[in-house]
Amino acid sequence: VVSTSPTKLVNVSYNNLTVNLGNELTPTQVKNQPTKVSWDAEPGALYTLVMTDPDAPSRKNPVFREWHHWLIINISGQNVSSGTVLSDYIGSGPPKGTGLHRYVFLVYKQPGSITDTQHGGNRPNFKVMDFANKHHLGNPVAGNFFQAKHED
């Protein structure tokens, strides 16, 4: 997903469930937008938050790599609701028989306000690195991920 892993965590919670570096959560548990998202933000700085699945439709055959599930730009500090939503949240929904998928949250510090409100494509085949390069975001400052598989 990215060439340089972030050194800090983005804290993500779904009610009383916490995303913790690859723990497994069910699609039902993450159906709705997280109830809390926070990171070590600089006051007055602007950030981009993305949630992406690099394993679409499966880890063995990721022909849709990446499928982005959420994209928000121009977040003031860590006040996610202050940002501009480019793609509404969609929870995990791995197809049957595709095994565990990783759902990755990345936070980028922006050099300034992003005025281009096009994310550069559809949800499948999104490339977070291309988006970051286009907007001069550099490496992510925080990240985290969970895993999920199809629910019967």
Curated annotation (Swiss-Prot):
Signal peptide residues on this chain, from the entry's feature table: none
Domain of life: Eukaryota
PANTHER family in UniProt: PHOSPHATIDYLETHANOLAMINE-BINDING PROTEIN (PTHR11362), PHOSPHATIDYLETHANOLAMINE-BINDING PROTEIN 4 (PTHR11362:SF82)
Similarity field: Belongs to the phosphatidylethanolamine-binding protein family.
Protein name stated in the entry: Protein D1
